[in-house]
Amino acid sequence: MYAILFELDTNCLNDNYEGNTYHNSYKLVNDFMIENGFTWKQGSVYFGGANIDAVTCVLVVQKLSKKYPWFSTCVKDVRMLRIEENNDLLPAIS
């Protein structure tokens, strides 16, 4: 399983996002990622489905930055992770 995670510079978004408030940018990214086979997990972390591979992750991020130029301008960090196991630790602290 692969994941994409990123951090956006909110000051940069405030200056470069075309909408009323930069908070809407996160909704646009969320919708885009879901449309491209990812599931939102938390914050700016998206897990890919069974058909998502490393090449697809790169292509999706490129497509995202082409569709929303403010993304590539304002992203401080964007990573692809390969996840061997997805274990929920919540039961360990409940």
UniProtKB/Swiss-Prot annotation:
MF annotations from Gene Ontology: nuclease activity; RNA binding
Protein name: Endoribonuclease VapD 2
InterPro entries: VapD
Gene3D superfamilies xref list: 3.30.70.240
Keyword Repeat: no
Organism, as annotated: Riemerella anatipestifer
Quaternary structure and partners: Homodimer.
Family (UniProt): Belongs to the VapD ribonuclease family.
Keywords of the record: Hydrolase, Nuclease, Plasmid, Virulence
